Structures are given as C-alpha cells and as structure tokens.
C-alpha cells in the first residue's frame, strides 16, 4: 500500500512531526511518501528530510517559496498544486492521500475540483490538528470541509479538537491521539556548537557585564537535569515553539518582566516567528532598566526532545492547541510542564496537575513560579511521565492509522 502524506513544508511544526512519526512506520507492505506544498528553507529542513529518508520515506520537494503573508502565498501554492499532484498521481498512483493542516487541505481540495476523476479510487484521510480552523476564511472553510466530510476523511487528535469541530461543522470525527517516544538525552549546555544567538548580539548597547547581563554568544548556564550540578541554584525554564500569538508570546513577555532579575530562574526561549521582535524588545527593556538579564533568545532547537532533561521546567502559555506534541514529549522525557489550561494542552496533562494556570492569568503564574523552588520536582516528573506513557505511544498511533488506511469504513 502506497501512502502519501501532504504537509505544508519540511520544517519544524507539530503537524509535520505527526506526519513524520506515522511515515516512519516499518510495517511490512506500507510504502510512505511525504510531499510538501511550500518549500521549507529553515535550518531544520535538511535534518528533517535526512531523518525521513533514513527511515525509508521518499520526500517530494516543492518549488513554491514558503512565505507567510495573510495566507496569500499558501492559497497561491494550493492553486498551483493540481498540476504537480497530477504528475504524482500518474507516476506513483497512491492508494491513500493523508493531509495535515489547512494549506495541504486546501491544495487537495483544489486538485479534486480540477481533476475530479483522479481521486475516485484513492482513500482520503485528513488529520485535524487544531481547535481553530480557517480563521478569517469562512467561505473557504465551507467548501473544503464539505469535501472532507463527503469522503469520511476526518480524524481528530484530541477530545477538544473533536468537540470544536463538531460544534462548528456538525460532524463528530473519530480520535487518534498523537504519539511520541522517549528519546536518548544529551546535554544542551555542553554541546560543541551553540544552538543559537543570544539577545546580547542583537541589542549589544543595552547589555553590560556590570549589570549582570549576558554578553557572550556561548551558553553560560551550567547543565541541569540528568547532568545536574550540586552548586546550581537557579531553575532553568524552557520556552520552545513558534513565536506567534497562538503560543502565548504576549504572556511570556509579561512573565519575563514579572520575574526580571529574579536569580531563582533562567529562561531559554527557543523559537522564531512574527513576534520575535516583541521578545527582543522585552529583553532589551529589562536590560535597559539595569536588571540582571535572566533570559536568552535562541533559534529553534533541532531534536529538542533529546535535550529536555537539560532543563527543569517547560513553560507553555499557549492560547490554544490541537493536542500539544511538545507537552507530551516533555512529559515522556521527564520535563515537567507549566501550562495554560487551554483546550489541547490541558488534555496532555493529568487532571490534577498542579502547574496549570487558568485563562493565562498572571497571578496564577506568579503563584506557580513562587512554588517551584520548593516543589517536589521528582514527584511531578513521575506523575506526568506515567500519564503520557499510558496514553501517547507512537506505535499505537501508527497501527491505528494503518488500520484506518486499510478499512472500508470507520473503525476508530
């Protein structure tokens, strides 16, 4: 059986990670391909492709540049996709086409309108990764969702995704939870090449050694987690993800200001996106006030799951999620999560999880961070690990999708 996954780009993203985890299945008789709609061009791209090819997955690159501007280039890519997809259909004759996120969803819908007969013998599968779809595009939503519902294609990744889809589009899709795996750990703070550039290299005029701010491009924080040093006095907090409104970047900046100069904590902010400037400005303002800078901004970390035990806590003030892969990976790799109790994120943590804020309330975060220095981190780690281990297995996810590919009708 030949399965084609359509993703936005070969780059860092939760949906791309899910597609890769499915496609890397070694089930006999399954041949996996991954097709990008827009050409990934990040530092992560060649590593992502190499990982897939090592697992025997064939990767199909796009020539359409990956540019984000009010979903304009994504729509252009979708409109140009049919001719490229026609070649794929004639050359490879896939048995299953599996789409992930709005850009591939739209691209396949456009192909179905241009070449309606080409999909008659192809099973369509579509994973819904988010609780919010087609923001600002109601007419597009109506057309695309009608297409996928007519093919009985929809699969949700969590209860919250299923419920939000049912409320808006009137269908209750089955659920297949995302799967994650435990990863061999390395020391992030003891690697030969720094993972990123500190803010000190962007706003050098604000930073000086007399104020205790960072002035070096090499990490100055001692290692934590599996290689914890006894003299380490502060807690190392990781924020990792796209610097976009969905991820709660505004709240992150408020917390950075709230804890500015607090020697109990050090924040590593790993990410990039449209709100990167906001983070840079926040850290520059803190430094300009003469407070010791207890944070650094670095690019996204490739293979992040393999560095998680280098940190004490993961901070996730997301406004909404589908089903957070990052939170699941953190729990399974023994990194406790401080999170906003939003749909898709709260689903990944125990019901009685004590590190949850509600409505991204700053007072909740103040209370949580004040409790951290005396919290029983080992107990928190084990609680989250046991929860994730029981619910989120990569192999279980692969087997359920492969059963769905083979089935004539719904089996979830």
Predicted regions mapped to residue ranges:
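Carbohydrate-associated surface elements
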Residues: 160, 179
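A conserved mid-protein helix/loop that constitutes part of the nucleotide-sugar donor-binding site
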Residues: 13-24, 235, 239-258, 274-277, ...
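Short hydrophobic beta-strand element within catalytic cores of glycosyltransferases
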Residues: 336-339
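A charged, aromatic-enriched C-terminal amphipathic alpha-helix characteristic of glycosyltransferases
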Residues: 378-406
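Aromatic "clamp/platform" in nucleotide-sugar-dependent glycosyltransferases that forms part
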Residues: 300, 319
């Amino acid at each position: 059986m030949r399965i084609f996954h359509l993703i936005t780009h070969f780059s860092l993203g939760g949906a791309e990670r899910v597609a890769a985890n499915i496609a890397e299945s070694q089930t006999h008789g399954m041949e996996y391909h991954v097709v990008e709609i827009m050409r990934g061009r990040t530092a992560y791209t060649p590593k992502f492709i190499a990982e897939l090819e090592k697992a025997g997955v064939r990767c199909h690159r796009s020539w359409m540049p990956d540019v984000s501007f009010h979903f304009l280039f994504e729509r252009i890519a979708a409109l140009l996709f049919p001719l490229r997809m026609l070649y794929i259909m004639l050359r490879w004759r896939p048995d299953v086409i599996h789409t992930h996120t709005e850009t591939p969803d739209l691209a396949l819908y456009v192909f179905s309108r241009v070449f309606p007969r080409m999909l008659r013998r192809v099973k369509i599968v579509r994973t819904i990764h988010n609780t919010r779809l087609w923001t600002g595009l109601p007419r597009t939503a109506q057309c695309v969702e009608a297409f996928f519902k007519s093919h009985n294609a929809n699969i949700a990744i969590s209860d919250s995704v299923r419920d939000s889809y049912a409320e808006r589009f009137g269908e209750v899709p089955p659920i297949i939870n995302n799967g994650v795996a435990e990863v061999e750990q390395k020391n992030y703070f003891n690697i030969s090449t720094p993972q990123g550039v500190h803010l000190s290299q962007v706003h050098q005029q604000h930073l000086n050694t007399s104020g205790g701010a960072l002035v070096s491009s090499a990490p100055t924080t001692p290692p934590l987690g599996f290689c914890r040093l006894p003299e380490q006095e502060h807690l190392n907090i990781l924020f990792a993800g796209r610097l976009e409104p969905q991820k709660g970047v505004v709240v992150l900046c408020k917390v950075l200001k709230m804890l500015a100069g607090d020697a109990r904590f050090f924040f590593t902010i790993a990410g990039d996106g449209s709100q990167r400037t906001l983070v840079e400005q926040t850290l520059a303002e803190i430094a300009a006030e003469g407070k010791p800078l207890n944070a650094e901004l670095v690019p996204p970390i490739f293979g992040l799951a393999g560095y998680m035990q280098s940190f004490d806590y993961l901070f996730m003030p997301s406004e909404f999620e589908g089903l957070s892969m990052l939170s699941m990976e953190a729990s399974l790799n023994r990194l406790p999560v401080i999170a906003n109790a939003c749909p898709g994120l709260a689903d990944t943590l125990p019901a009685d999880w004590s590190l949850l804020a509600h409505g991204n309330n700053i007072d909740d975060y103040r209370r949580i961070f004040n409790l951290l220095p005396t919290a029983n981190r080992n107990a928190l780690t084990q609680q989250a690990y046991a929860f994730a281990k029981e619910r989120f297995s990569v192999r279980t996810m692969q087997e359920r999708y492969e059963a769905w590919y083979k089935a004539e009708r719904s089996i979830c």
